[in-house]
Design a protein with these regions (language model features):
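Conserved phosphate-binding/catalytic region of the ribokinase-like
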Residues: 48, 75-177
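Ribokinase/PfkB-type carbohydrate-kinase core domain
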Residues: 1-108
Length: 177
Protein backbone atom coordinates (compact mmCIF):
# COMPACT_ATOMS: atom_id res chain seq x y z
CA UNK A 1 0.00 0.00 0.00
CA UNK A 2 3.05 2.25 -0.07
CA UNK A 3 2.15 3.40 -3.57
CA UNK A 4 -1.19 4.62 -2.23
CA UNK A 5 0.47 7.16 0.05
CA UNK A 6 2.19 8.69 -2.98
CA UNK A 7 -1.03 8.63 -5.01
CA UNK A 8 -3.19 10.39 -2.38
CA UNK A 9 -4.13 13.94 -3.41
CA UNK A 10 -3.10 16.72 -1.05
CA UNK A 11 -6.39 18.62 -1.27
CA UNK A 12 -8.71 16.00 0.21
CA UNK A 13 -11.66 16.96 2.39
CA UNK A 14 -12.16 13.45 3.87
CA UNK A 15 -11.03 9.87 3.37
CA UNK A 16 -13.18 6.73 3.43
CA UNK A 17 -11.87 3.18 3.60
CA UNK A 18 -13.15 -0.18 4.69
CA UNK A 19 -11.56 -2.97 6.67
CA UNK A 20 -11.25 -5.37 3.73
CA UNK A 21 -7.89 -3.85 2.72
CA UNK A 22 -6.23 -3.13 6.07
CA UNK A 23 -3.01 -1.68 4.62
CA UNK A 24 -4.94 0.68 2.36
CA UNK A 25 -7.23 1.67 5.21
CA UNK A 26 -4.21 2.52 7.36
CA UNK A 27 -2.76 4.74 4.62
CA UNK A 28 -6.11 6.48 4.15
CA UNK A 29 -6.57 7.08 7.88
CA UNK A 30 -2.98 8.27 8.34
CA UNK A 31 -3.43 10.66 5.41
CA UNK A 32 -6.61 12.01 7.00
CA UNK A 33 -4.85 12.44 10.33
CA UNK A 34 -1.86 14.16 8.70
CA UNK A 35 -4.15 16.52 6.76
CA UNK A 36 -6.47 17.09 9.76
CA UNK A 37 -9.56 15.97 7.83
CA UNK A 38 -12.19 13.34 8.64
CA UNK A 39 -10.98 9.77 8.21
CA UNK A 40 -13.92 7.37 8.10
CA UNK A 41 -13.61 3.59 8.43
CA UNK A 42 -16.43 1.35 7.20
CA UNK A 43 -15.84 -1.27 9.89
CA UNK A 44 -17.24 -4.52 8.56
CA UNK A 45 -16.32 -7.94 9.95
CA UNK A 46 -13.64 -9.10 10.24
CA UNK A 47 -12.14 -5.94 11.73
CA UNK A 48 -9.13 -7.23 13.71
CA UNK A 49 -6.72 -7.03 10.77
CA UNK A 50 -7.49 -3.31 10.42
CA UNK A 51 -6.98 -2.51 14.11
CA UNK A 52 -4.22 0.04 13.47
CA UNK A 53 -6.44 1.98 11.06
CA UNK A 54 -9.34 1.88 13.53
CA UNK A 55 -7.10 3.37 16.23
CA UNK A 56 -6.34 6.50 14.20
CA UNK A 57 -9.62 6.97 12.32
CA UNK A 58 -11.62 10.04 13.31
CA UNK A 59 -14.87 8.15 12.67
CA UNK A 60 -15.42 4.41 12.97
CA UNK A 61 -18.76 3.42 11.46
CA UNK A 62 -19.42 -0.21 12.28
CA UNK A 63 -22.09 -2.41 10.80
CA UNK A 64 -23.86 -4.46 13.46
CA UNK A 65 -21.78 -7.47 12.40
CA UNK A 66 -18.58 -5.44 12.50
CA UNK A 67 -19.37 -4.10 15.97
CA UNK A 68 -20.12 -7.60 17.22
CA UNK A 69 -16.90 -8.91 15.66
CA UNK A 70 -14.92 -6.13 17.37
CA UNK A 71 -16.55 -6.34 20.81
CA UNK A 72 -18.23 -9.75 21.08
CA UNK A 73 -21.52 -7.97 21.87
CA UNK A 74 -24.59 -8.39 19.63
CA UNK A 75 -26.56 -5.39 20.94
CA UNK A 76 -25.55 -2.36 18.80
CA UNK A 77 -25.75 0.13 21.67
CA UNK A 78 -23.71 -2.01 24.05
CA UNK A 79 -21.21 -2.78 21.30
CA UNK A 80 -20.83 0.93 20.50
CA UNK A 81 -20.27 1.77 24.16
CA UNK A 82 -17.68 -1.01 24.47
CA UNK A 83 -15.88 -0.06 21.24
CA UNK A 84 -15.66 3.56 22.36
CA UNK A 85 -13.61 2.47 25.37
CA UNK A 86 -10.70 1.44 23.15
CA UNK A 87 -11.05 3.79 20.16
CA UNK A 88 -10.34 7.52 20.13
CA UNK A 89 -12.51 8.35 17.12
CA UNK A 90 -16.27 8.87 16.97
CA UNK A 91 -17.86 5.40 17.26
CA UNK A 92 -21.01 4.73 15.26
CA UNK A 93 -23.00 1.54 14.67
CA UNK A 94 -25.50 1.33 11.82
CA UNK A 95 -28.46 -0.85 12.74
CA UNK A 96 -30.64 -0.85 9.62
CA UNK A 97 -34.30 -0.13 10.25
CA UNK A 98 -33.56 0.54 13.95
CA UNK A 99 -31.39 3.50 13.06
CA UNK A 100 -27.86 4.48 13.97
CA UNK A 101 -26.27 4.76 17.39
CA UNK A 102 -23.25 6.93 18.12
CA UNK A 103 -21.35 7.57 21.30
CA UNK A 104 -21.22 11.17 22.49
CA UNK A 105 -19.27 11.86 25.69
CA UNK A 106 -19.73 8.26 26.83
CA UNK A 107 -23.47 8.21 26.14
CA UNK A 108 -25.32 6.34 23.40
CA UNK A 109 -27.32 8.66 21.14
CA UNK A 110 -29.76 7.09 18.67
CA UNK A 111 -30.68 8.53 15.28
CA UNK A 112 -33.91 7.02 14.02
CA UNK A 113 -34.18 5.44 10.59
CA UNK A 114 -36.76 6.63 8.09
CA UNK A 115 -39.92 4.55 7.87
CA UNK A 116 -39.93 3.37 4.27
CA UNK A 117 -41.11 0.42 2.24
CA UNK A 118 -37.95 -1.58 1.63
CA UNK A 119 -37.47 -2.77 -1.94
CA UNK A 120 -33.76 -3.68 -2.01
CA UNK A 121 -31.03 -3.27 0.61
CA UNK A 122 -28.14 -4.14 -1.72
CA UNK A 123 -25.46 -1.42 -1.37
CA UNK A 124 -27.34 0.40 1.41
CA UNK A 125 -24.31 0.29 3.69
CA UNK A 126 -21.99 1.55 0.98
CA UNK A 127 -24.40 4.38 0.19
CA UNK A 128 -24.63 5.23 3.90
CA UNK A 129 -20.85 5.37 4.35
CA UNK A 130 -20.27 7.38 1.17
CA UNK A 131 -22.98 9.89 2.08
CA UNK A 132 -21.60 10.17 5.62
CA UNK A 133 -18.11 10.91 4.24
CA UNK A 134 -19.49 13.49 1.80
CA UNK A 135 -21.47 15.18 4.56
CA UNK A 136 -18.43 15.39 6.84
CA UNK A 137 -16.31 16.67 3.95
CA UNK A 138 -18.95 19.36 3.42
CA UNK A 139 -18.53 20.43 7.04
CA UNK A 140 -21.67 18.96 8.58
CA UNK A 141 -21.42 17.97 12.24
CA UNK A 142 -21.63 14.27 13.06
CA UNK A 143 -25.32 14.29 13.94
CA UNK A 144 -26.36 16.03 10.73
CA UNK A 145 -23.98 13.84 8.73
CA UNK A 146 -25.57 10.71 10.20
CA UNK A 147 -29.03 12.00 9.34
CA UNK A 148 -27.92 12.87 5.79
CA UNK A 149 -26.38 9.41 5.34
CA UNK A 150 -29.43 7.67 6.79
CA UNK A 151 -31.67 9.56 4.38
CA UNK A 152 -29.46 8.53 1.46
CA UNK A 153 -29.57 4.89 2.57
CA UNK A 154 -33.35 5.01 3.03
CA UNK A 155 -33.85 6.35 -0.50
CA UNK A 156 -31.55 3.62 -1.82
CA UNK A 157 -33.50 0.91 0.05
CA UNK A 158 -36.78 2.14 -1.41
CA UNK A 159 -35.42 1.47 -4.93
CA UNK A 160 -34.31 -1.65 -6.76
CA UNK A 161 -30.72 -2.16 -7.81
CA UNK A 162 -27.47 -1.82 -5.92
CA UNK A 163 -25.53 1.31 -6.76
CA UNK A 164 -28.05 2.16 -9.48
CA UNK A 165 -30.47 2.91 -6.66
CA UNK A 166 -28.14 5.41 -5.00
CA UNK A 167 -29.69 8.87 -4.74
CA UNK A 168 -28.20 12.17 -5.80
CA UNK A 169 -27.33 14.84 -3.25
CA UNK A 170 -30.36 16.83 -4.41
CA UNK A 171 -32.66 13.86 -3.81
CA UNK A 172 -31.30 13.45 -0.29
CA UNK A 173 -31.69 17.14 0.52
CA UNK A 174 -35.25 17.21 -0.85
CA UNK A 175 -36.40 13.93 0.75
CA UNK A 176 -39.34 13.91 3.12
CA UNK A 177 -40.63 10.67 4.62
Amino acid sequence: AGWLREAMPQDLQATLADTRWPDGALVAMQTAKDQNIPGIIDAEAPVAEASEALKIASHIAFSEQGAEDFTGLSDPEQAALEAAKSLSGQVIVTAGERGVVRIVDGTAVWHQAHAITVVDTLAAGDVWHAAFAVALADGMDEGDAIDFASTAAAIKCARPGGRNGAPTREEVLNFSA
